[in-house]
Structures are given as structure tokens and as C-alpha cells.
Amino acid sequence: ELFAYTIRLLESCTLSDRVGFALMAFAPVDLRLKAFVVTWAIHYGKLTADGLIKCPIPLTRNNRCLVANASPVSTDNALKRWKEEGAWIRDGDFVTFPAAFVDDAYQWMRSAEESSEYTYPNTFRELLEALPPLTNPWY
């Protein structure tokens, strides 16, 4: 279990500093929010058999605005669009979304990295399938 948490922590570290600065400078609000959802899902998400990711609601409205460096109106509009598209389904304290929904953010984050010998999975779903499973008390 400690090994699984360590792998997930290292995965988040590779997605952090340079990518975070680039996102804040160049990405639209939707992509900034999805990038956060990617890192949140790495730590707290559970991939279901039908390709959906279920995780606890990521943030309060206030914190969502701080993380995305965006106004409440911008973040509210993004979430409203996601819900209308059926991509962001809230169920109590959890949210469910298709793994492919965040692929644009995942791919953008990966393209911003330096090249290396390690080949990352092409899709976010493939990444979650490759990570060691966590036994999470929330589920």
C-alpha cells in the first residue's frame, strides 16, 4: 500500500511545477480545472469497469477559483457546461466522469514535459489502469 501511494505521489510530482506555471499562463479555464481533476483523480479516483472515474468532490467553490486562478463566474460556467454535456455527474459527496473527459488536459500536460526514455500511457484511463490500486476507505 505504501508503494502504491509513493508511485502516485511521484506521478503527481512529475505533473506539478513547470506544467502548473504553463497552465496558469496559457490555458483556458476549462483546461486548468481539468488539469486539477487529473491530479485529484490520481490520488482519490477509482476507475470503474465502464471507464468512468469516481472520486470525492474535488474542491469548494472558493478553493476551485484559487486553484484555477479564475473568477467564480468562469469556474461556475465551466462546471455548468460539463454537467449539461453529461460529463460531470454529481452523486452526493462524489463526482463521476468519463476518463476520456480529461484526456485533453492529460495530453497537454504530457506534451509539456521533457523527453525521456520512459513512455507514459497515451490516455488518462491507461494511466489509471497502470497505477497500483489503492484501498480507499471512501468507497
Language-model segments: what does each one mean?
Residues 5, 9, 28-32, 59, ...:
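Residues forming well-ordered secondary-structure scaffolds
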Residues 2-3, 22, 29, 53:
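Residue-level recognition of alpha-helical structural elements
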